[in-house]
Amino acid sequence: MSKRFKFDSSEMIYLTDKLMNAASNRYSIVVQVARRAKRVRYDTVENIDDPMIKPVQRALMEMTDELTEPELLRD
């Protein structure tokens, strides 16, 4: 059984809050995170680059890193 990389829950809450505050529509950002997580999950099955991070956590990290480009948060 593989161990998952442990994230600090306060860090994940901070990233989520940061992403929600930057979005104009909460529903659309939740859908975008879900789609990104699904894509990340399928990419990790093929590439197996870092199976220790859950797909939703990786999606949140990637999307908060992309906050400097606001056009990525729109549909």
Curated annotation (Swiss-Prot):
It catalyses: RNA(n) + a ribonucleoside 5'-triphosphate = RNA(n+1) + diphosphate. InterPro entries: DNA-dir_RNA_pol_omega (IPR003716), Pol_omega/Rpo6/RPB6 (IPR006110), RPB6/omega-like_sf (IPR036161). Gene3D superfamilies: 3.90.940.10. SUPFAM superfamilies: RPB6/omega subunit-like. One of its GO terms (biological process) is DNA-templated transcription. Promotes RNA polymerase assembly. Latches the N- and C-terminal regions of the beta' subunit thereby facilitating its interaction with the beta and alpha subunits. This is DNA-directed RNA polymerase subunit omega. It comes from Microcystis aeruginosa (strain NIES-843 / IAM M-2473). The lineage of its organism: Bacteria, Bacillati, Cyanobacteriota, Cyanophyceae, Oscillatoriophycideae.
